[in-house]
Amino acid sequence: MAAKIRQNDEVIVLTGKDKGKRGKVTQMLPNGKVIVEGVKIITKHEKPVPALGKAGGLVKKEAAIDASNIAIFNPKTNKADRVGFRFEDGKKVRFFKSNNEII
């Protein structure tokens, strides 16, 4: 099955404390979760690793959110959109369902 949302897609968050925020998908995880740039920022406490020259302390980073809580962002309509698949010239392509434009 082809993925409706892929890495580097611009998405919008549908639920949670970050609802309405937009960002690029930086990583797709195998358990149905994604990491979106600038969304769900958490603070991790990291230990120093002198052998690698890493200083410890508080580090802010993005946490994974479920793929069902995001939707692809359509720049033409400035809204969240659904994704469909169709074949064009023998290749399977994704398109926005609202305006049939290829992604």
Curated annotation (Swiss-Prot):
Query: Keyword set for this entry?
Result: Ribonucleoprotein, Ribosomal protein, RNA-binding, rRNA-binding
Matches recorded under SUPFAM superfamilies: Translation proteins SH3-like domain
Which Gene3D superfamilies does the record associate with it?
Answer: 2.30.30.30
| GO BP: any one term | translation
The UniProt record lists the keyword Plastid = no
In terms of PROSITE patterns, this protein maps to: RIBOSOMAL_L24 (PS01108)
Instruction: Quote the InterPro entries the UniProt record gives.
Output: KOW, Rib_uL2_dom2, Ribosomal_uL24, Ribosomal_uL24_CS, Ribosomal_uL24_KOW, Translation_prot_SH3-like_sf
Superkingdom field: Bacteria
Any single Gene Ontology cellular-component annotation: ribosome
Picking any one GO molecular function of the record gives: structural constituent of ribosome
Which protein family is named in the record? Answer: Belongs to the universal ribosomal protein uL24 family.
Oligomeric state and partners?
Answer: Part of the 50S ribosomal subunit.
Query: What's this chain's function?
Result: One of two assembly initiator proteins, it binds directly to the 5'-end of the 23S rRNA, where it nucleates assembly of the 50S subunit. One of the proteins that surrounds the polypeptide exit tunnel on the outside of the subunit.
Q: What is this protein called?
A: Large ribosomal subunit protein uL24
Organism of origin is Actinobacillus pleuropneumoniae serotype 3 (strain JL03)
Q: What is the lineage of its organism?
A: Bacteria, Pseudomonadati, Pseudomonadota, Gammaproteobacteria, Pasteurellales
